[in-house]
UniProtKB/Swiss-Prot annotation:
Phylogenetic classification of the source organism: Archaea, Methanobacteriati, Methanobacteriota, Methanomada group, Methanococci
Domain of life, per lineage: Archaea
Annotated GO CC locations: cytosol
CDD domains registered for this protein in UniProt: VWA_YIEM_type
Alphabetical list of SMART domains matching this protein: VWA
Organism: Methanocaldococcus jannaschii (strain ATCC 43067 / DSM 2661 / JAL-1 / JCM 10045 / NBRC 100440) (Methanococcus jannaschii)
InterPro entries on file: VWF_A (IPR002035), vWFA_dom_sf (IPR036465)
Name of this protein: Uncharacterized protein MJ0077
Length: 382
């Protein structure tokens, strides 16, 4: 039994209808208080509760859920669903794996919530009513729930890959000037950190904006657009769709960080939607992207024709097979050569057709929809 007050009870009564009950309402309420309350005071300690509150992973989850009714609801539903499964298997006391899954799940969800629609100059949802509305959509939509989990996992992976690569700038030193940009500090200035007298002189020059800096001549690969053609034909329904959409959104985030426009082209047997993104997307846009699906046949030529209208490399994600006319193949080759652009194809559960191999600079076949294969894609594109 957990001690709770009138405020805790009021919060629970106000939001309990947002979740699916996998345990009894009373058991679910107790679990909610475990996650929601700032200080958990246990009146009657069972072996199960003792294992939960003393586990390091529970404390990590608490750092996310404490006094946040939305994250507490999400954690409660996930925990209760998994605990029910353990009970049915007679393994109720074996919660180590459950807490491990919960910690990973909450990290993925919070990463998805915070990665989009926030930050300076972008629309963010700090209004509790709006956040509760988004949480309710997440809890009632299993497809969206799975999508946000995969997206959060891939997002952290993509950002890590991006941060690793930007340590090695894609330019060259071409001139020296005076300035306070410590990132572009000339290597000869580093010796001044070792000697006290030289360090004092460096501080003086820093105050006067006079340390030696180098300018970077940016590589052309940082210019132009980044175009992603995403197949949403009937055969992409299910896990393929979730995996591919998560990849596409992660590539969007990295593209915008590089100050590239991100062009999204959704297609099946025709081009269904083209959107141009120049700033971070809102959470409503994420929900819309996660929900949209078309389900028709497959046509490669139409989306590729649209993609060539933009100025940048093209990523083509599909699980289908479709031939491209010889005339169009020649056009693509000419455009690639003239504009110095590349086409990357990601083929899910199918080998690329002859025509797709012909137009692609790199073709990757994905047989398993896992984090490992996602990393393979990020290695190629980030």
């Amino acid at each position: 039994m957990i001690r709770y007050d009138k405020y805790d009870k009021m919060v629970w009564e106000g939001c309990k209808n947002k979740i699916t009950f996998h345990l009894s309402e009373r058991e679910t309420e107790i679990v909610f208080y475990l996650f929601f309350k700032y200080e958990v005071e246990i009146l009657t300690e069972t072996d199960l509760i003792k294992k939960i509150v003393r586990d390091r992973r529970f404390k990590n989850v608490k750092s996310i859920t404490t006094l946040d009714e939305n994250y507490s609801l999400i954690a409660t539903e996930f925990f209760c669903e998994k605990l029910k499964e353990l009970k049915e298997k007679g393994r109720e006391e074996d919660i180590s794996e459950l807490l491990d899954e919960l910690e990973s799940y909450m990290e993925n969800i919070t990463s998805s919530f915070s990665s989009f629609g926030s930050g300076e100059g972008y629309k963010s949802y700090t209004d509790p009513k709006k956040k509760l509305e988004l949480t309710e959509k997440l809890l009632k939509n299993n497809k969206l729930k799975e999508f946000m989990k995969v997206l959060g996992k891939f997002k952290r992976m993509a950002i890590k890959k991006y941060k690793t690569k930007i340590k090695h700038f894609s330019g060259e030193k071409y001139s020296i000037n005076l300035g306070n940009n410590l990132i572009n500090l000339l290597s000869s200035e580093y010796k001044n950190f070792a000697e006290e007298i030289l360090f004092v002189d460096l501080l003086r020059r820093y105050n006067e904006n006079k340390p030696l800096n180098y300018k970077i001549l940016e590589n052309n690969e940082n210019c132009g657009d980044f175009v992603v053609c995403l197949d949403l034909s009937g055969s992409m329904r299910g896990n393929k769709e979730i995996w591919a959409k998560a990849i596409a959104l992660c590539l969007m985030d990295i593209s915008l960080k590089r100050n590239k426009r991100y062009i999204s082209i959704l297609f099946d047997d025709g081009v269904r939607d083209i959107k141009i993104y120049e700033k971070k997307v809102s959470f409503d846009e994420i929900l819309e992207f996660a929900s949209v699906f078309y389900g028709g046949g497959t046509n490669f030529e139409k989306p590729l024709r649209e993609a060539l209208k933009f100025n940048g490399d093209i990523v083509f994600i599909t699980d289908g097979e479709c031939e491209v006319s010889l005339e169009f193949l020649e056009k693509i080759k000419e455009e690639k050569q003239r504009r110095k652009i590349k086409i990357y194809s990601i083929c899910i559960n199918t080998k690329p057709t002859v025509s797709l191999r012909q137009i692609s600079d790199v073709s990757v076949t994905i047989y398993e929809l896992t984090s490992k294969t996602a990393e393979k894609v990020f290695d190629m594109l980030i």
